[in-house]
């Protein structure tokens, strides 16, 4: 049981770090053939991330930014609550609070990435003629899976 909780703790920390990276880095869409990428915050061309987003004032991108930041916040809160419950909770109880907080993180990731996918991932007008999803987009979907698994495991596990 201790090994399972330690492994869950490590995966939770890795998920929080991946959420930070995917939200901060500007590689959500990458242009084919030229050294350019587009993120949630800036356009990057030839290693310089000076350009602001052409659609930076759109409500959809602001919603994606907000939900990704909320997912980071809920992931960290869930981690702190898990550690707190680990040391203060009586034996036999379940980690409901940390599990439900992590599932809220999962929901924020789902909403944010779904909005981005709907509005920007397949829109040819906003991006380069030929582009593909960058590592941040893929990393966010990986965090989506991990946060769901972690949230469910927190809800199922009992402290022994």
Curated annotation (Swiss-Prot):
Please give the InterPro entries that the UniProt record associates with this protein.
EMP_1, PMP-22/EMP/MP20-like, PMP22/EMP/MP20/Claudin, PMP22_EMP_MP20
Tissue spec. comment: Most prominently found in the gastrointestinal tract, skin, lung, and brain but not in liver.
Pfam families hit by this protein: PMP22_Claudin (PF00822)
- Report the glycosylation sites: 43
Q: Where in the cell is it found?
A: Membrane
Span-the-membrane segments of this chain are: 1-21, 67-87, 95-115, 137-157
Give the record's keywords alphabetically: Glycoprotein, Membrane, Transmembrane, Transmembrane helix
GO biological process: what's one of them? apoptotic process
Q: How does it sit in the membrane?
A: Multi-pass membrane protein
Q: Name the principal localization, coarsely classed.
A: membrane
Q: Which GO terms describe its cellular component?
A: plasma membrane
Family to which the UniProt record says this protein belongs: Belongs to the PMP-22/EMP/MP20 family.
Q: What is the recorded name of this protein?
A: Epithelial membrane protein 1
What is the originating organism of this protein? Rattus norvegicus (Rat)
């Amino acid at each position: 049981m201790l090994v399972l909780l330690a492994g869950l703790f490590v995966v939770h920390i890795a998920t929080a770090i991946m959420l930070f990276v995917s939200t901060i880095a500007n590689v959500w869409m990458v242009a084919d053939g030229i050294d350019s990428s587009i993120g949630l915050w800036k356009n990057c061309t030839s290693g310089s991330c000076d350009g602001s987003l052409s659609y930076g004032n759109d409500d959809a991108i602001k919603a994606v930014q907000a939900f990704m930041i909320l997912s980071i916040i809920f992931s960290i809160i869930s981690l702190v609550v898990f550690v707190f419950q680990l040391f203060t909770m009586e034996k036999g109880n379940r980690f409901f609070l940390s599990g439900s907080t992590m599932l809220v993180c999962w929901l924020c990731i789902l909403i944010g990435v779904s909005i981005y996918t709907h509005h920007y991932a397949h829109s040819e007008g906003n991006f380069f003629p030929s582009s593909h999803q960058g590592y941040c987009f893929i990393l966010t979907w990986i965090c989506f899976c991990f946060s769901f698994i972690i949230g469910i495991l927190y809800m199922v596990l009992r402290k022994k």
